[in-house]
Every structure is written in structure tokens, then in C-alpha cells.
Regions:
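Detector for the c-type heme attachment site
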Residues: 19-25, 37-38
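The canonical Cys-X-X-Cys-His
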Residues: 13-21, 94, 98
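C-terminal capping alpha-helices of c-type cytochrome domains
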Residues: 58-102
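Short cysteine/histidine-rich zinc-coordinating motifs and their immediately flanking basic loops
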Residues: 27-33
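Structural microenvironment flanking redox-active thiols in thiol-disulfide oxidoreductases
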Residues: 28, 40, 45-46
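A short secondary-structure junction motif
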Residues: 35, 39-42, 71-75
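Short Fe-S-cluster ligation motifs
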Residues: 44-63
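Electrostatic cytochrome c docking/interface patches
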Residues: 1-12
Length: 102
């Protein structure tokens, strides 16, 4: 089954506790507008953890899927306290939504 952008938008509400989908507007976490295709820890107006700065990846669907499954296992020392999205279909939906934010 294909990823569902609308379901991802609904699921993103959990992310929106700490992140925005608006360019240049950060909360506790960085804005996720344009995150797909962006290098990790690359927004100038956000203070990333040292762990995220060292992660040194470009956010694509595969990297996001792995990270969203268990953020602290992928980037030990990340400031992100969200435990992750265990359901693969839900992660795919969120990623499909994130891909629309450009």
C-alpha cells in the first residue's frame, strides 16, 4: 500500500509539539520544512546537539525511516526525546507528508 500524505499530516501533529512545518520557524526542535534532501544539523538558526552535528547525513526517506523508528539509537545523545514511531506504515505516511514540505 502506498504512503498516505493526509494520514502523515495527522500523524505529524505529534511531531508538531516540538517542530513546525513552516520555513524558518523553530520550536524546541528545528523546522521540518524542507527537511527531505537537507543535510542534518544544517539550519543556521537552530542550536543542534553535538550528537546531531556529528551525525552528518542528508535526510532522505531511508534515513528518516531509520531515525524515526528509534531516534536515540540512531543518534545517541540527540536532544529529541520522542521515542519513535514503531509502525513502519505510520513512518512512511509521515515521511510522505514531510516530502510535501518544500
Amino acid at each position: 500500500m502506498a504512503a498516505d500524505v493526509e494520514a502523515g499530516k495527522v500523524e505529524f501533529k505529534k511531531c508538531a509539539l516540538c517542530h513546525t512545518a513552516e520555513p524558518g520557524k523553530n520550536k524546541i526542535g528545528p523546522s521540518l520544512f524542507g527537511v527531505v534532501g537537507r543535510k542534518s544539523a544544517s539550519l543556521d538558526n537552530f542550536n543542534y546537539s553535538e550528537a546531531m552535528k556529528k551525525f552528518d547525513h542528508t535526510w532522505d526517506a531511508e534515513t528518516l525511516d531509520t531515525y524515526l523508528a528509534d531516534p536515540r539509537a540512531v543518534v545517541p545523545g540527540t536532544k529529541m526525546i520522542f521515542p519513535g514511531i514503531k509502525d513502519k506504515a505510520e513512518r512512511e505516511d509521515v515521511i510522505a507528508y514531510l516530502e510535501t514540505l518544500k
